[in-house]
Structure formats: C-alpha cells, structure tokens
Amino acid sequence: MSNASSAKEATAPKMGATLSPDLNVVKQSKGPVMTLADEFYKVGPGPSSSHTIGPMRITYDFYQRCTTLPADQLAKATGLKVHLFGSLSATGKGHGTEHAALAGLLGKEPATVDPLFLDEMKANPEQTYPVKLGDKTFNLSLADIIYDTTKGDFPHPNTMTCKLMGRDKPIYVQEYYSVGGGFIEWKGYQPPKKGQPKYLYSTMKELRQHAEKNNLSIAQVIMANEVAVSGKTEKQINAFLDKIANAMLATVKSGLSVKEGVLPGPIKLHSKAATVWERAQDEKYESDRAIAMVAACALAASEENARGHVVITAPTSGSAGVMPAIVYALVNSKRQVSMEKIREGLLAGLAVGYLCKHNATLAAAEGGCQSEIGVASAMAAALIAQVMGSNPQTLENAAESALEHHLGMTCDPVAGYVQVPCIERCAFGAVKAWTAFLIATNEIESRHRVDLDATIKTLADTGRDMNAKYKETSEAGLAQNLTIC
C-alpha cells in the first residue's frame, strides 16, 4: 500500500457497521413522524441537496461551533480543513460540493447565499477567502476541501469530517452526515426536542385512519400536527407554504425563459425546456399539450438546478423539477388552481415525503434514484389528489402507484453531474405522478392491491440491497457506458 493511500485511510472514519451507533439510535427508535415543513422544503442552490445544500449546512454549523470554542483553543488554531468521504468524494466535483463546503466555512447559508458567489468561486479556483475566528484571521481556499477515500465502512455514504487545525494536529474535529434532502446529522446526534403531534402516526395506514376517523383531509391532519409540533400558527405555516409555492413557480418561470444554452460541465448538454414549452402551445400539437406542458415545466426547474440556481428540495434538489412542474401546471392551466389549494397540496405532499424519510431514505447515495425521483413523484401525485378533492384512500393509492413504478431506479449520474439522466427523469416523474392520479381516480378504491406502507418498505429494502455502484457513485450504468467527448 502506498504512503498516500495510508494517509488517506488514516483520516477516514472507522466503523464496523453500515451505520454508526449514533445513527442507529435515530434510525431504529423512530417513534411518530416529527418532521416539519420548514425542515423538509428547503430553498437553496443546486445541483444537489445531499452534495450541495447538506455540505454547506454542515460547514456552516461547524464554523458556528468553532466560534464558541475557548479563546485559548482558538489562539492555537492555524486553519480549517474538510474531508469528504464516500459518495461525497466520488461525485462531489460534479455536484459543486467543494464550493458549497467552502462557502459554509465562510458563513454562507443555503437559503441566502447568492448563486453568483458560487459561480465566481468556480471561475477563480485559486482564490483565497479570509475567515475570522477569535482574534485570528485565516485565508481559506478550495484546497482546504479534501476529496478523501470513496471506499470504506462509513457511518453513512455521505460522510464528512470538519477540522479546526493546530500546528501539529487537529484541535477540534466533528464528524457529520448529509443524510438526504438537505438534512444533516452528526456523531452523537439526537433529534431536537419538539412539541407532541396532535395525531401520532408512523405509517400511512395510521395517518389515513386519523383522517377518516375525524372526517379530515390528509392536508388538515398534517396542518394540525405542524401547529402542535412547531408551536407556530396556521397563518405562519401558510405564509411559509406560500413562500415555497412562489419559489417553485419562480424556478419554473426562470427555466422556461432560457431559450437556448449549454448547461455547465463536460457533458455539453443543451437546455430544452423552452423548446418543449413552445411546442406545447402550438395548435398542431394540441393533443400533446397537457403532457408536454408538465414535462417542459419539470425540465425547466431541473435545468435551473443544473445551473446551480435556486431550487426547492421536494424532497431533494436532484428531483426538484417534479413538484414545481405540477404546481406550475395547476396554477397556469385552465384550472387556475388557487394558492389555498396549492398550500393544501403541498401539505399532502409532505405527508408522503415525511413517511418516506421516516421509514426509508431520501438519499440516492443510500437508496438510488428511486429515493429521489420516486419519492418526488409520489409526493406530486398526493398533491394533485389533494388539490382535486380526492379522499385519503384515493390520495394514498395515487402516491403508491407513483412510487411503485420507480422502484429499483438507479442513480448513475454521468460525469458526476446532476444532468444525465437526472433532468429528463424529473419530466418522467412529473408525468408519472399525473398518470398515477388518473388511474387512482378511475379505479375502485378497494381493488387497489398495494398499499403505500408496503411500497415504502420495498423502497427501503431495494435501496439496502442495491449495489453501491448504482448509488450516486458514477461507477456503473450510464455513468460508465456513455462516452463524454
């Protein structure tokens, strides 16, 4: 073994199991769903929630922790280092992970960072940036973000270690995990204390029973829990949902405004959203209009994600074209769905997303693309069903069908970029969501043989069994078989 290899392995977190004991506490002791809307729907720069938003949140958190260290420790500090492992190391270059991680160390947060700042960082890779800790100022650069080993028994496929360096050794080290959808955890993590949900549930069956017993919609049950757990008012929660809906609409509109152009990176992929949208408006193709409009909207938001522009995790950045496409189509079609109905749809989407996070995963590095596009499609199907006034059983059937027909989907991003096959997959995910809704509303409810809980368990089982080469490592599939010239 070379000295370089030995040095790399020495920095890697050593674990004897797939998950560390700390993460096992979180994963196995589930209890009821406790996730909140403002934790799930996040606004931030693309192209990846797990590889861009998550790492920026992690390094921002680490920087904030460092500012609270005793003055005598900070006096010995000489700099900051970040080590990326597993999938973060394997595909981080194409996901802009190093830029996101450095931005977090500089005090930038995903919700407020200017994407132009990240673009400038990419254009000037040798640039140094001052960061102040205590009485000291360090100059940081992309060289301080280290792509470490991709192979190992990591606590999570997206593992990072952040270090405050001294002259001879680290002064302070924290191990983190970007667990999907922009959510982060760390060694020793325990879920934050929250209020108690009004309606306790950890499965779709339990959630649906609450709705049916109390003559409520799925959206109403979720809203009641949001109020109880967060301590916020319905008015405050609705204001947040309006913000998310408007951000989704803006992302699609921005993507549709780009008439032509090549997306960043070596693939040289041309944007096509505007072209598909224009054809959808042509009377010659009226019979194709509904599908073409939804597909164009999904392409638009997904292309914005590929540009590193602002998107909304629903549930992830890689799948951020699906839900916005449905929202845009509902608002701008002849239906002209009201914002009140869209809010209800976003709550119904949360119900499905929460359960997938709770009982499976939202990270392609853990579950493949089924965990991203599949979950997004199921959330979108639930949104449509809620907006159209479907009952809880029909809503579940629609979400189940959408998720079922993404099971087994691999994540094999070409060249590590969230473009091929990711962008078109968002279009197919959105169209499948609509198809799932149509089937669910035209079948006899009681004859639907597969329930959502079984499908979510299958999602988790399939992800666990899937070869790691097909889980956001770019080591197989299209990533290996498509030649980039």
Question: PLM features: what roles do these ranges have?
Answer:
Residues 336-337, 348, 355-427, 440-448:
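Hydrophobic alpha-helical bundle architecture
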Residues 50-67, 324-336, 381-389:
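Alpha-helical support elements that line or immediately flank enzyme active sites
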